[in-house]
């Protein structure tokens, strides 16, 4: 145990409180001065001395008590063992001594394992990592869950320990296991806002589409808890880091994740994501990441790419297959355009009422789509600039385009008002015109009445002639 003055509470891992506040341990200040047994002790005295030695982190006294015949798996009040206590305070040396003396690394108390206790301990990640590594080396099972079905990797993810997560996966931990609420390790990391853990889990093959019991994905959980960086990243169509370490062997994974401890490597864990701009993310989403260097060499931005014509694709060395993927994506993004050119010219007065009404309805629908699109963008944009995760060009470019949009909307509003006034004027003039021709509905109604009367009259005459002819034949 690291030198210090005060130790933390020894509580059950994962937030599951024990039946007593101290679980039978004396919580207080550490006295690091080594103690020795003054003489033979009674069994009750041995247990009490053992607890004090564990509490103070007195390794030599612990060893002396074990040498005197005290069991390394002694059960203290409420069922805790010495190893469980040592793991709960991340005392690496004490954990090592107890394991070397034969302590059971697979012990559990009411499904609370020592490995879970170590993963949820209150200590530095370095100390927790060493304790977890010792327990795993003694065959502690990383997939045994507590009463809430939470596994060690979920506790490590919840508490923000990416290296512990990686170590557990390297020893066979199931990265996509779900607890009683459907939470995975990724969901817990997203909920708590641990972006480094999120990225590490995605590298290790975590499934970001798994839902909780109430139907929420990790990205939605992140958004609900206001972790917008994580929400934006998890919302991408394809994550370039996904499954990056999944195919490595256990030894390769441990070597890669635990031996690179430099500051540069630690900084890289998130910069590998933030370095991606909008162009890179668009290409990765389509599986066209191989085009990134080509487009960057030619200084082609995403905006330029999305407005390219067929000949420009070919000229810039983009193959037909890649062209088809880009064009298909553009087709999905496009709002259905109104083909104004196909409508008859209003100026020639050849447009029918139905065609004109259809034109207005399409125009109104298009405006509705545009309003919804802008509202969605507003709701998704982060409030603070430091939460923007994509590389943006100068905000001045966006502002100038927005100003043009506002101007165009004002012009559109003015023209629509003119159109409305013109239609109202035509309607008023027609109603006051004495030469106004009745609508087809009115004419057809009058004609139908005449036709009905004529038909009845003809039928009547026909029936009368038939009776007369029949009477004449009988005579």
From Swiss-Prot:
One annotated GO biological process: regulatory ncRNA-mediated gene silencing
SS bond list: none
ANK repeats: 45-74, 78-107, 110-144, 148-177, 181-210, 214-243
InterPro entries: Ankyrin_rpt, Ankyrin_rpt-contain_sf, Asz1_SAM, SAM, SAM/pointed_sf
SMART domains on file: ANK
Pfam families reported for this sequence: Ank_2, Ank_4, SAM_2
Gene Ontology, cellular component aspect: pi-body
Main location: cytoplasm
Residue positions, PTM Phosphoserine: 17-18, 20
Region (Disordered) location: 1-24
Signal peptide from the UniProt entry: none
Limits of the SAM domain: 272-334
Keywords from the UniProt entry: ANK repeat, Cytoplasm, Developmental protein, Differentiation, Meiosis, Phosphoprotein, Repeat, RNA-mediated gene silencing, Spermatogenesis
Subcellular compartments: Cytoplasm
Protein task: Plays a central role during spermatogenesis by repressing transposable elements and preventing their mobilization, which is essential for the germline integrity. Acts via the piRNA metabolic process, which mediates the repression of transposable elements during meiosis by forming complexes composed of piRNAs and Piwi proteins and governs the methylation and subsequent repression of transposons. Its association with pi-bodies suggests a participation in the primary piRNAs metabolic process.
UniProt subunit comment: Interacts with DDX4, PIWIL1, RANBP9 and TDRD1.
PANTHER family: ANKYRIN REPEAT, SAM AND BASIC LEUCINE ZIPPER DOMAIN-CONTAINING PROTEIN 1
Protein name: Ankyrin repeat, SAM and basic leucine zipper domain-containing protein 1
Protein source organism: Neofelis nebulosa
Native organism taxonomy: Eukaryota, Metazoa, Chordata, Craniata, Vertebrata
Gene name, Swiss-Prot/TrEMBL: ASZ1
């Amino acid at each position: 145990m690291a030198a210090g003055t005060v130790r933390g509470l020894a509580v059950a891992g994962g937030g599951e409180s024990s039946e007593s506040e101290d679980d039978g341990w004396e919580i207080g200040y550490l006295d690091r001065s080594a103690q020795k047994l003054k003489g033979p002790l009674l069994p009750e005295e041995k247990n009490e001395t053992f607890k004090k030695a564990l509490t103070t982190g007195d390794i030599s006294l612990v060893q002396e008590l074990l040498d005197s015949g005290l069991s390394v798996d002694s059960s203290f009040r409420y069922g805790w063992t010495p190893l469980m206590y040592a793991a709960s305070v991340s005392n690496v040396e004490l954990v090592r001594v107890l394991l070397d003396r034969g302590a059971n690394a697979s012990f559990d108390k009411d499904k609370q394992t020592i490995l879970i206790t170590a993963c949820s301990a209150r200590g530095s990640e370095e100390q927790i990592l060493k304790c977890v590594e010792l327990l795993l080396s003694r065959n502690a099972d990383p997939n045994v869950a507590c009463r809430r079905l939470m596994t060690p990797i979920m506790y490590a993810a919840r508490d923000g320990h990416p290296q512990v997560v990686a170590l557990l996966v390297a020893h066979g931990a199931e990265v996509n296991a779900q607890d009683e609420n459907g939470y995975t390790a990724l969901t817990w990391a997203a909920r708590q806002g641990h972006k480094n853990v999120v990225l590490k889990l995605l590298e290790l093959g975590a499934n970001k589409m798994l839902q909780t019991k109430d139907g929420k994905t990790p990205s939605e959980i992140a958004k609900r808890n206001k972790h917008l960086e994580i929400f934006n990243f998890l919302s991408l169509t394809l994550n370039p880091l996904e499954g990056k370490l999944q195919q490595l062997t256990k030894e390769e994974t441990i070597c890669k994740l635990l031996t690179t401890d430099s500051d540069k490597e630690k900084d890289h864990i998130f910069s590998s994501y933030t370095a991606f701009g909008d162009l890179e993310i668009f290409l990765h989403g389509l599986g066209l990441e191989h085009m990134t260097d080509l487009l960057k060499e030619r200084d082609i931005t995403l905006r330029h790419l999305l407005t390219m014509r067929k000949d420009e694709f070919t000229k810039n060395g983009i193959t037909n297959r890649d062209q088809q993927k880009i064009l298909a994506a553009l087709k999905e993004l496009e709002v259905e355009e109104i083909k104004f050119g196909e409508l008859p010219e209003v100026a020639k007065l050849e447009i029918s009422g139905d065609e004109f009404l259809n034109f207005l309805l399409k125009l109104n629908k298009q405006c509705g789509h545009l309003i919804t699109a802008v509202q969605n963008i507003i709701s998704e944009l982060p409030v603070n600039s430091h939460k923007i995760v994509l590389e943006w060009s100068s905000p001045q470019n966006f502002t100038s385009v927005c100003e043009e949009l506002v101007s165009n909307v004002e012009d559109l509003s003015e023209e629509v008002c003119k159109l409305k006034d013109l239609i109202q004027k035509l309607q008023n003039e027609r109603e006051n015109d004495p030469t106004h021709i009745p609508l087809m509905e009115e004419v057809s109604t009058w004609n139908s009445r005449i036709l009905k009367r004529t038909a009845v009259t003809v039928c009547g005459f026909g029936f009368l002639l038939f009776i007369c002819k029949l009477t004449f034949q009988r005579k």
